[in-house]
UniProtKB/Swiss-Prot annotation:
Naturally occurring in which organism (per UniProt): Mus musculus
Quaternary data: Binds DNA as a dimer. Can form homodimers or heterodimers with other AP-2 family members. Interacts with WWOX. Interacts with UBE2I. Interacts with RALBP1 in a complex also containing EPN1 and NUMB during interphase and mitosis. Interacts with CITED4. Interacts with KCTD1; this interaction represses transcription activation. Interacts (via C-terminus) with CITED2 (via C-terminus); the interaction stimulates TFAP2A-transcriptional activation. Interacts (via N-terminus) with EP300 (via N-terminus); the interaction requires CITED2.
Regions of compositional bias (Basic and acidic residues) in chain numbering: 428-437
Signal peptide annotation: none
Protein name: Transcription factor AP-2-alpha
Disordered: region residues: 14-107, 414-437
GO molecular function list: chromatin binding; cis-regulatory region sequence-specific DNA binding; DNA-binding transcription activator activity, RNA polymerase II-specific; DNA-binding transcription factor activity; DNA-binding transcription factor activity, RNA polymerase II-specific; DNA-binding transcription repressor activity, RNA polymerase II-specific; RNA polymerase II cis-regulatory region sequence-specific DNA binding; RNA polymerase II transcription regulatory region sequence-specific DNA binding
In-chain residues carrying the UniProt-annotated modification Phosphoserine: 239
Amino acid sequence: MLWKLTDNIKYEDCEDRHDGTSNGTARLPQLGTVGQSPYTSAPPLSHTPNADFQPPYFPPPYQPIYPQSQDPYSHVNDPYSLNPLHAQPQPQHPGWPGQRQSQESGLLHTHRGLPHQLSGLDPRRDYRRHEDLLHGPHALGSGLGDLPIHSLPHAIEDVPHVEDPGINIPDQTVIKKGPVSLSKSNSNAVSAIPINKDNLFGGVVNPNEVFCSVPGRLSLLSSTSKYKVTVAEVQRRLSPPECLNASLLGGVLRRAKSKNGGRSLREKLDKIGLNLPAGRRKAANVTLLTSLVEGEAVHLARDFGYVCETEFPAKAVAEFLNRQHSDPNEQVARKNMLLATKQICKEFTDLLAQDRSPLGNSRPNPILEPGIQSCLTHFNLISHGFGSPAVCAAVTALQNYLTEALKAMDKMYLSNNPNSHTDNSAKSSDKEEKHRK
């Protein structure tokens, strides 16, 4: 009978599982009245305190019984924190930490115990990650313990200027990334940290380093030459007076046009410490000299000087113009004018010879006054090194003309005054005899 009763209970149990409950409650608790039933009572539908129980992740309304010892988001690096250098040990909070937004707002106002001056260092997205810069917390060395915390706000005030120009270039020009100059009061405090400043602040590569090689535009196909473009030259092209944009600079460097050509060029410039803003407007008018790099412009000026020196018909021009002024009464006055003009040209060429504008890899020390040197540098930057040598070559051709004109004037004067010629020849013969003795 007991066996049949057990089978009936099992059958009713199956019906209860399929049909549900009649009064809204399950029949499972009724099985506890059967003393010899192999089934045990069902566990309650509420959590009981248990040391081994791990609560699942639920929204904040769920309250666990045992206290939470750590912030569940402590493993996530907070981009708005000042990282391990300023981190304070987190207190133990009993129970769920509550709304994280309120906790973060409290941390942002207190800055984890730091002085109130650090609250002005926004936006924090401009700062580089301290872990990446130091390559781990051990790179700080033993000098971190001696670093006073109260001096850190003054030292960190220089961080927003990391992206500012590190050299004397106007604001609208290329931004050159360089080491930040710290004041004397803060240098002692920061010097205790053995940090590579080039890695921390974005070091600038050597200005004499070759950025790329550009084929010449004026050379023939049979003798194509390439010119090396240095980092200093790229910086000069991005700076006043030209202020080239990405499109013009890509044309100067003979880069192929592509969809992301400007972006790739800006990324390449950023690696060498130069920043080319997007949507920049050029400052100077575009000429044919704009397409030339400095090496080719200097080469062109040298060839132009050679042609002026060797091929300019200075003697023919001087004889032609002197025939138009063959009057003996004008020859003396004309000769004086030619001598004065030659002296003025000599002064002009001597001034241009003292020009010390930066060109290529050279940055010579200036000789002239800053006022006149800055004007010559402006002209040299516009012409990329072609201007001053070309002007000197042209003035040299003018001086050759003046020299030939003076020789022609002397011949005309001697032809018109034969007696003076004999007197001069006699005097010259007497001088030669005295010199022989």
